[in-house]
Curated annotation (Swiss-Prot):
Mapped WD repeat ranges: 92-131, 134-174, 177-216, 219-260, 262-300, 303-342, 345-386, 388-426
Region (Disordered): 423-446
Any single biological process term in GO: intraciliary transport
Matches recorded under PROSITE patterns: WD_REPEATS_1, WD_REPEATS_2, WD_REPEATS_REGION
PANTHER family with a match to the protein in the record: PHOSPHOLIPASE A-2-ACTIVATING PROTEIN
Subunit structure: Interacts with IFT46 and FLA10.
Gene: DAW1
InterPro entries per UniProt: G-protein_beta_WD-40_rep, WD40/YVTN_repeat-like_dom_sf, WD40_repeat_CS, WD40_repeat_dom_sf, WD40_rpt
Main function: Functions as a cargo-specific adapter between intraflagellar transport (IFT) particles and outer row dynein. Required for efficient dynein-mediated transport into the flagellar compartment.
UniProt entry tagged with the keyword Ion transport: no
Organism: Chlamydomonas reinhardtii (Chlamydomonas smithii)
Top-level taxon of origin: Eukaryota
UniProt keyword list: Cell projection, Cilium, Cytoplasm, Cytoskeleton, Flagellum, Repeat, WD repeat
Name recorded for this polypeptide: Dynein assembly factor with WD repeat domains 1
Any Gene Ontology CC annotation: cytoplasm
């Protein structure tokens, strides 16, 4: 039976259109990624290209498709020039924080702490929703199962990982198997697998539905401190103190490539959205760009004078940034490899960096007790977020880019709100990893 297109769904970050179609009575989704979309694109040429390449879309869908493309362009053109003001100071924990993370919609976030708990917060009121208790040591690594946001996973120095209901706080499973501390973790975008990385030199894959271990990823010769899935969820990258990163096949648990070349411990790794590239940062003062298919190093980014502590791609994968203990961040154009800007101004090391969903702004968190907001086009520092009394080690934007959270060793978490943002969840959104809301949806019954 031929597939029938039933609905278009819009995804803003990164730009794309999700095709919802029916085949043999089963509803499925297929993304059309528009990662290179710009406001000056020739829309009619783009429409013809999509219709020519995608069998599900016939010529009579052109008007609906045109409207969606214009919606994406309008979203890009929205002014992102607002500054941020302090909204709430949360005396979050009695002991220092370890990490903080938003859910996809941005209405809730979580904080982990040395006090052995994880707390869930309402972003728009600053109130604690509930506390996740049960770990016997530091809660270090935490995450929502975005884009769904209905589960939370916590990784602890007690060697276990716990899976929780994000709405009720109910404990689903305690995942046991690591021999030492768990320091990094992630859900796959499909929310079916959890990956955990440990100081025992291994990573493990766990089944979300059953809580059972699916595989142990063994091969690193030192601690695993970074990991992440690609968008398709079929590959995982791990970064280790053994100077290497590794690519693994999630289905088999086998190592696909060893990414060797750094001359010091790997501190951070990440896939681009398309899943074609991996960036790694190292204490050897460099970051490296790797080809996923071949495992080959495409380029070595030099220029920092001290350890690279964090690396990141923007949502579309067109920009890449490295943050360093030298107090600077370096912003690159991914395709050309050119360093567009060196972001200088912090008086201490930068341990965390994050793009806003639009890829127009960047925040850096520093030991100088401040966060800085940067313009990605000009490299200009737009704002210094001041008020913390100790090192800031965590920072994040929500999905709409109008709220920022910062976590500090002063035991507080601060919520910063864009001056144009309402205190309610921001308007329509879509979601970036395969789940999209029908903000503009066209349905077909033929």
């Amino acid at each position: 039976m031929a597939a029938k297109l039933r609905k278009f769904l819009l995804r803003y970050y990164p730009p794309g259109i999700i095709l919802q179609y029916e085949r043999d009575g089963v509803m499925k989704q297929k993304p059309i990624d528009l990662l290179d979309l710009t406001p000056d694109v020739d829309v009619e040429v783009l429409l013809s290209q999509i219709i020519r390449q995608e069998p599900l879309i016939s010529e009579n869908r052109r008007p609906a498709l045109r409207q969606l493309i214009h919606r994406l362009i309008d979203k890009m053109l929205e002014q992102q020039h607002h500054s941020f003001t302090l909204f709430k100071v949360l005396r979050a924990h009695i002991l220092p924080l370890t990490n903080c993370a938003f859910n996809k919609s941005g209405d809730r976030f979580i904080t982990g702490s040395y006090d052995r708990t994880c707390k869930v917060w309402n972003t728009f009121t600053g109130e604690e929703v509930f506390t996740l208790e049960g770990h016997k040591n530091v809660v270090y690594a935490i995450a929502f199962n975005n884009p769904y946001g209905d589960k939370i996973v916590t990784g602890s120095f007690d060697k276990t990982c716990k899976l929780w209901d994000a709405y009720t706080g109910q404990l689903y499973y305690t995942l046991k198997g690591h021999q030492t501390e768990i320091v990094c973790l992630s859900f796959n975008p499909q929310s079916t697998i959890i990956a955990t990385g440990s100081m025992d030199n291994t990573a493990k894959l766990w089944d979300v539905e059953t809580g059972q271990e699916r595989a142990t990823l063994a091969g690193h010769r030192a601690e695993i401190v970074s990991l992440g899935f690609n968008t398709g969820g079929d590959l995982i990258v791990t970064g280790s103190f053994d100077h290497d990163s590794r690519l693994w096949d999630v289905r088999t648990g086998q190592c696909v490539h060893v990414l060797s070349g750094h001359r010091g411990e790997v501190s951070s790794t990440q896939f681009n959205y398309a899943g074609t590239l991996v960036v790694s940062g190292s204490i050897d003062c460099t970051s490296r760009l790797w080809d996923v298919r071949s495992g080959r190093c495409l380029s070595v980014k030099q220029g920092h004078t001290d350890e690279v502590l964090d690396v990141a791609f923007d949502a579309a994968g067109t920009k890449m940034v490295s943050a360093s203990a030298d107090g600077s961040a370096r912003l690159y154009h991914t395709l050309t490899g050119v360093c567009q800007h060196t972001l200088v101004g912090h008086e201490g090391e930068i341990s965390k960096v994050a793009f806003n969903p639009q890829g127009t702004r960047l925040i850096t968190a520093s030991s100088d007790k401040t966060c800085r907001l940067w313009d990605c086009d000009t490299g200009e520092c737009l704002q210094v977020l001041e008020g913390h009394t100790d090192e800031i080690f965590s920072c994040a934007f929500n999905y709409e880019g109008d709220f920022i959270i910062t976590g500090s060793k002063d035991n507080t978490c601060r919520i910063w709100k864009a001056l144009t943002a309402s205190s309610q969840p921001a308007g329509p959104g879509g979601a970036g990893g395969g789940l999209a809301r029908p903000t503009t949806a066209f349905s077909y019954n033929d």
